[in-house]
Amino acid sequence: PLVRQAQGTEFALSDLFLGNMTGSFGETSALLIILGGAYIVWKKSANWHFIASSVISFLVLYAALFYSGIQGAIDPVYALFSGSFLFAAVFMVTDPVSASQTTNLGRWIYGTIFGVMTVLIRVYAGWPEGVTFALLFANMFAQLIDHLIKEQKKKSKEKAAAA
């Protein structure tokens, strides 16, 4: 869908939402991805902070670029429902092994890095996607994010105890 949109032809938004198009297995129906995401959050297999921060940062940055007329930026909702971003935000970013796991702030930062990097790669790089690179980039910083936040909390507690 992203390539077709760049060529000037695109799928209807309803087709993207329902999955009435070609694409990689599992990423074509936004409706099913959202339902699957709701299920894994409800079952507490995934933390909603990852998903929310990824999607919010993705939509905010895409909207800023699209409405400011940046070449290569497409409609944010169309961008959300096309490609593998939504699939990755729900099922890959929430991976308990590689993601920032110990603090809610770390989860928000991790998801935001993923969402922002996906947009920047999609708009400014030569690839129509960018999800894999963005996920790897965010994973590089996951442990550092957790470490820095824990250290900051530790220093705050020590300061409060000393006062």
Model regions: which residues?
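Alpha-helical transmembrane segments
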Residues: G69, M92-T103
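Hydrophobic alpha-helical transmembrane segments in multi-pass integral membrane proteins
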Residues: L65-I70, V116-E129
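Membrane-helix boundary elements
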Residues: I33-D75
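Cytosolic-side transmembrane-helix boundaries in multi-pass membrane proteins
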Residues: V123-A163
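Structural signal for the C-terminal ends of transmembrane alpha-helices
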Residues: V41-S45, V93-T94, F141, I145
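Loop-to-transmembrane alpha-helix initiation sites
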Residues: P76-F85, G106-W108, A125-A138
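Long hydrophobic alpha-helical segments that form multi-pass transmembrane helix bundles
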Residues: P1-I33
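Hydrophobic alpha-helical segments embedded in the membrane of multi-pass proteins
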Residues: L31-I34, A52-V60, A79-T94, W108-V116
